[in-house]
């Protein structure tokens, strides 16, 4: 195993585009209110793992998937993660982590984030894509630090909605 630093170094050195498939999380979160069941994801997961071994990662957990599995689907989100890990052993599994909010809708104590990240890493998450809706890095810091105590990778993301190429853009620019 390369470890997080070795993984990041290898990624920076490669020339091929690294593709992340977000359909296991974002596609049905955005289009179907996250109502795709685990059994349906498991029907395609081994096929994808076999046909697309070069895929950089599969974002399959986090965001609303945790909450919806419990409240609306009557499923165990941890069982979903474990089964996807078994079905795609050759893929980097990725999750979306809401910084201090973890997978909830309100900030949690640091100890909760630490325990959640440790369990998610142990269950199969290789890459944690960490963000904060207000781009507050201080709100992302507990999650980043928690991931750094595991052998998983912390992929920190900033969110924006604007046109970087618009000459009138004053907030987000390429300068």
For each feature predicted by the language model, list its residue ranges.
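Flexible inter-domain linker/hinge segments
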Residues: 1-13
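Conserved phosphate/anionic-ligand binding catalytic regions in large, soluble enzymes, centered on
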Residues: 22-33
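N-terminal phosphate-binding or glycine-rich loops at protein starts, especially the Walker A/P-loop
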Residues: 32-40
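Catalytic domains of carbohydrate-active enzymes, especially glycoside hydrolases
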Residues: 40-64, 118-127
């Amino acid at each position: 195993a390369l470890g997080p630093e070795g993984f990041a170094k290898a990624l920076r050195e490669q020339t091929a585009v690294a593709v992340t498939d977000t359909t296991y999380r974002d596609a049905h979160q955005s289009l179907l209110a996250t109502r795709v069941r685990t059994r349906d994801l498991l029907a395609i997961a081994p096929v994808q793992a076999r046909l697309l071994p070069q895929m950089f990662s599969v974002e399959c957990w986090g965001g609303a998937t945790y909450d919806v599995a419990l409240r609306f689907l009557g499923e165990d989100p941890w069982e979903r993660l474990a089964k996807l890990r078994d079905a795609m052993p050759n893929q980097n599994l990725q999750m979306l982590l809401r910084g201090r909010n973890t997978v909830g809708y309100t900030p949690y104590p640091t100890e909760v984030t630490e325990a959640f990240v440790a369990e998610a890493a142990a269950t199969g998450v290789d890459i944690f894509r960490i963000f904060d809706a207000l781009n507050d890095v201080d709100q992302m810091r507990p999650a980043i630090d928690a991931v750094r105590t595991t052998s998983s990778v912390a992929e920190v993301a900033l969110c924006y909605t604007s046109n970087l190429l618009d000459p009138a853009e004053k907030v987000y620019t390429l300068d």
